[in-house]
Design a protein with these regions (language model features):
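Ankyrin repeat domain, specifically the short helix-to-loop turn at the C-terminus of the second helix
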Residues: 144-152, 173-181, 214-220
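Short alpha-helical "patches" and their helix-cap loops
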Residues: 4, 101-110, 176, 214
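Extreme N-terminal basic, low-complexity initiation segments
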Residues: 1-9
Length: 220
């Protein structure tokens, strides 16, 4: 591997060209996206070790390691820490932060360990614990990513699930068959339709917000 003098590390990281997703935290944009894929049963412990290894390599001046850190656009003179390399791994897999990435890894592992409960597991990321049960916070970015990657299969004509994702066409079909469902709690979490829409954490995501708002307007 090629090595650089210690005093050149941060300058190298700061100026090395890169191709990765939009870096919202530092205001950097690019036109091409390269996102790494996880195995079917990702191991969070292994990923943590990868972050530690990357940190050691970068501190040693390894050019390949520093090139991976370049998208972080760290200020010159930054003392590289573990949270920097964890953030790097998260970015490489298409996540804005390590906590988001960690949550996705745990969710994907849970789906792999118990595929029969995939819908119930997914709903725990859509709704906070006060709705879905437990003490966990909702993770809309995780729920959306699981859908995008085809890791969760939703019932096609369940109107309460449609409320969670803002599928107004399903709501309209359900009402044409039985208008009474609008006033009943139902679905896996036994929620009234409007509650299922209003408490869906997918409302926080721009790509989902308008469709959920449309469902809420239609329900009222």
């Amino acid at each position: 591997a090629t090595h650089l003098p210690t005093d050149s590390l941060i300058e190298f990281v700061h100026h090395f060209p890169f191709v990765l997703p939009e870096l919202q935290a530092v205001g950097v944009r690019c036109t091409e996206v390269l996102v790494k894929r996880l195995p079917p049963r990702p191991d969070l412990g292994h990923l943590k070790k990868q972050a530690k290894t990357l940190l050691a390599q970068a501190r040693a001046g390894d050019a390949a390691a520093l090139a991976r850190l370049a998208p972080l656009a760290l200020p010159a003179g930054t003392d590289l820490r573990l949270h920097h390399t964890q953030w790097c791994l998260a970015r490489e897999h298409g996540f804005a932060s390590w906590p988001q990435f960690q949550a996705f890894v745990l969710a994907r592992r849970a789906l792999a360990d118990d595929p029969q409960r995939s819908l119930a597991t997914w709903l725990r990321w859509v709704y906070a614990g006060d709705i879905a049960g437990g003490a966990d916070n909702a993770r809309p970015e995780v729920a959306a990513r699981l859908l995008d990657e085809g890791l969760v299969s939703l019932p096609a004509d369940d109107p309460w699930i449609a409320c969670a994702v803002g599928d107004i066409a399903v709501l309209q079909r359900a009402s044409a068959q039985d208008v009474g469902w609008l006033h009943r709690a139902g679905g896996p979490l036994a929620l009234p339709p409007l509650v299922a829409v209003a408490h869906s954490s997918l409302l926080r995501l721009p790509g989902w917000r308008e469709r959920l708002h449309a469902c809420a307007r239609w329900l009222v």
